């Protein structure tokens, strides 16, 4: 969680710029004595940040300095509603090990961060539909995803009907790993989404990488729980984001 001094720094350097930006991409700082309505908006954003940090920390204490944020956050980031993230990694589990966990959508609520409920229905030869509730009290979002399966190499989830975002795409693909180590594979993880609200986008942008890493790690930890220790240490091959 954020320490008091860090939260004050966020109020001045991050929270106010998030609330109002110029169309040209330059941030307009507010008067040191903001109006009551702006105080309310900032307070809501602080609560959202606290909730995000609480979920991202996984129960461990984390502290963030204002200099860290200044190094990685630009005013253009605050204007983005569309984000994407890709990561290719060599892991010490077989394609089937990874596929069996990622395709187990009905149990996402047991091990995937932010997923509170996951129900599968409308099964077909190429996949199924899944109703999910994600979020953290008191904020929750319900949506339906179309999940496409190509065992044991692909799990693709798409949603275009969410109230929180315009679309959400999540794709996992698996390819053979090292020839001399059968229990290894190369996983390619991709996530792309666009929020309807610029305010939600701004909050997510601050912790975008952290959230993506935490979600990916949740699947790896679940594979470890089911299949045991990995055959080799994982190695990140490529990683990129918008």
UniProtKB/Swiss-Prot annotation:
GO terms for biological process: cellular respiration. Gene3D superfamilies: 3.30.530.20. GO terms for cellular component: mitochondrial inner membrane; mitochondrion. The keyword Mitochondrion applies. Keywords: Membrane, Mitochondrion, Mitochondrion inner membrane, Transit peptide. It comes from the Eukaryota. It is found in: Mitochondrion inner membrane. It holds the Pfam family Polyketide_cyc. The keyword Electron transport does not apply. It is a peripheral membrane protein. One of its GO terms (molecular function) is ubiquinone binding. Interacts with coenzyme Q. Belongs to the COQ10 family. Required for the function of coenzyme Q in the respiratory chain. May serve as a chaperone or may be involved in the transport of Q6 from its site of synthesis to the catalytic sites of the respiratory complexes. This is Coenzyme Q-binding protein COQ10, mitochondrial. It comes from Drosophila melanogaster. The gene is Coq10.
């Amino acid at each position: 969680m954020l320490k008091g001094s860090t939260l004050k720094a966020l109020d001045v350097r991050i929270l106010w710029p998030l609330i109002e930006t110029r169309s040209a991409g330059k941030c307009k700082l507010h008067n040191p004595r903001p109006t009551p309505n702006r105080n309310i908006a900032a307070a809501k954003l602080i609560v959202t940040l606290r909730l995000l940090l609480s979920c991202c920390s996984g129960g461990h204490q984390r502290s963030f300095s204002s200099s860290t944020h200044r190094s990685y956050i630009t005013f253009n980031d605050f204007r983005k509603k569309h984000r994407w993230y890709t990561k290719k990694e060599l892991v010490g589990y077989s394609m089937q090990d990874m596929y069996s966990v990622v395709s187990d959508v009905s149990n996402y609520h047991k091990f995937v961060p932010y997923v509170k409920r996951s129900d599968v229905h409308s099964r077909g030869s190429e996949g199924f539909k899944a109703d999910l509730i994600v979020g953290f009290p008191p904020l929750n979002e319900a949506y339906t995803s179309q999940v496409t399966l190509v065992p044991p190499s692909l799990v693709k989830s798409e949603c275009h009907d969410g109230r929180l975002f315009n679309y959400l795409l999540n794709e996992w693909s698996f390819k053979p790993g090292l020839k001399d180590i059968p229990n290894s594979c190369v996983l390619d993880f991709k996530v792309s989404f666009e929020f309807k609200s610029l305010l939600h986008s701004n909050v997510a942008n601050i912790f975008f990488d952290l959230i993506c890493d935490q979600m990916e790690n949740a699947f790896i930890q679940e594979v470890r729980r089911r299949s045991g220790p990995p055959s080799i240490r994982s190695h990140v091959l490529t990683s990129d984001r918008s």
